[in-house]
A protein has these predicted regions:
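Surface-exposed loop and turn segments in beta-propeller and other repeat-based domains
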Residues: 53-67, 105-112, 155-171, 209-225, ...
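Structural signature of eukaryotic scaffold interfaces centered on beta-propeller domains
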Residues: 15-20, 67-77, 116-123, 172-181, ...
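Loop/turn-rich, solvent-exposed surfaces of beta-rich toroidal or solenoidal domains
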Residues: 272-353
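Short loop/turn segments immediately following beta-strands, especially the blade-tip
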Residues: 41-50, 92-101, 150-154, 201-210, ...
Length: 401
């Protein structure tokens, strides 16, 4: 599977502003699972003669991990956390010198928790992660939140299980609101064994689970299923949460004893329970929410200056087999890196947004020379680390400069 009045959002502390990013980092799996998964560094400088070329790679030293989520934006310390979901491992890449990337460390599960999914930085430099499962003998149950120090050592953890409310909760993604001492998490099961409508509210200071909200259906009747990505609005108090079934919900009241969630928007979903049909990892640029829509083979730009009344202001229609899934923005810029499924499985696209109007367009210059379709081609035979064949990118972020 798999985030606003000038409402610039993020998953935690404010993102930096900068001039154009020179690189994009993409976490990719070897397509035939015969060679190591790896992180690729791509030239993202539009002035460069090597624009869209792969300038370096660093193997993870592990095969078939299913590279999935990275952090949603490049952290200030230059160390990017990423998960190999099927292997239940975290990989930390040192990208302080982008043309010489290195694997800083890797580690497994902080038992009893397993299968890390999403990561968010905390003001103290630690990393808070969602873990889908708690291992219980020969089976698995609802996981929880785990806080790590910068070296990957577990500091504390908390269970997300609420069997009386929703036994299908599987901690998925998260948004941190330090000023309110709150964390908001979603609950989608990566294996689709359950279809949770839960959003959970936590106290950040001690990781106490305060509240589990079950989203109500929207106008279509099924928008509440599979809660996906929360993003914090610029007021630091309001959160928008999307669902894989293409609903959008507003969560507020986080500064009080009881938070509230309400449906505000729906986009098209074809009803198929598969990654290439879902609405997935969004990005927010200024007052615009950029939603990948697998069903519509498009990126959709919503003006959310009034979070109760999102309205479509831009749309980028891709190829008829392209299913965009992951969107990440350039810090302070107007570019978006996009990965996905279907026709995008072994490609990465660059889009641009007009920060004044929300209009979207494809950057066709960001294309591998000789490729038949726009984007960086990951279906190649040879990489800087060797002739390991095609790869499938998923998590992707821009460098901070």
């Amino acid at each position: 599977m798999a985030a606003l009045a000038a409402c610039h959002a993020g998953t935690g502390p404010a993102r930096p502003t900068s001039s154009a990013s020179r690189f994009v980092f993409l976490w990719a799996g070897d397509a035939d699972k015969a060679a190591s998964d790896f992180l690729a560094v791509v030239d993202a400088d539009p002035r460069s003669a090597g624009y869209a070329s792969v300038v370096a790679t660093v193997p993870a030293g592990a095969i078939g991990t299913r590279p999935h989520h990275t952090e949603y934006a490049m952290p200030a310390d230059g160390l990017l956390w990423a998960n190999g979901f099927d292997a239940s491992r975290t990989f930390v890449f040192d990208l302080r010198h982008p043309e010489r990337p290195a694997l800083a460390r890797t580690f497994g599960d902080p038992l009893p928790y397993g299968h890390p999914h999403s990561y968010a930085r905390l003001p103290n430099g630690h990393v808070l992660a969602t873990f889908q499962w708690e291992m219980a003998g020969g089976h698995h149950e609802t996981g929880g939140l785990v806080e790590f120090d910068p070296d990957g050592r577990m500091v504390r953890a908390a269970r997300a299980a609420v069997p009386a409310i929703d036994p299908g909760v599987r901690p998925y993604s998260l948004a941190v609101l330090p000023a309110l001492d709150r964390v908001v998490t979603t609950a989608s099961d990566m294996h689709l064994e359950s279809r949770s409508a839960a959003v959970q509210i936590w106290r950040l200071s001690d990781l106490t689970l305060l509240q589990t909200i079950l989203l109500a259906p929207g106008r279509r009747g099924d928008e509440q299923q599979l809660t996906a990505e929360p993003r914090v609005l610029a007021d630091g108090r309001t959160v928008l949460v999307n669902t894989f079934t293409c609903g959008l919900y507003r969560v507020d009241g986080l500064d009080g004893p009881t938070a509230r969630a309400r449906w505000v928007y729906s986009s098209t979903w074809n009803g198929r329970w598969e990654g290439k049909s879902f609405c997935a990892v969004p990005e927010v640029v200024g007052r615009f929410w950029i939603q990948p829509s697998g069903t519509e083979h498009a990126l959709v730009s919503l003006d959310v200056s009034d979070p109760d009344q999102p309205r479509e202001v831009g749309r980028l229609v891709l190829g008829d087999t392209d299913a965009p899934h992951w969107v990440a923005g350039e810090p302070g810029g107007d570019r978006l890196i996009v990965t996905g499924y279907g026709g995008l499985e072994s490609r990465a696209l660059m889009a641009r947004i007009d920060r004044a109007t929300g209009a979207l367009r494809l950057d066709e210059a960001f294309t591998t020379p000789g490729a038949a379709r726009p984007g960086v081609d990951f279906g190649r035979d040879t990489w800087p680390h060797g002739a390991t064949g095609p790869a499938i990118p998923h998590g992707a972020v821009f460098s901070r400069r």
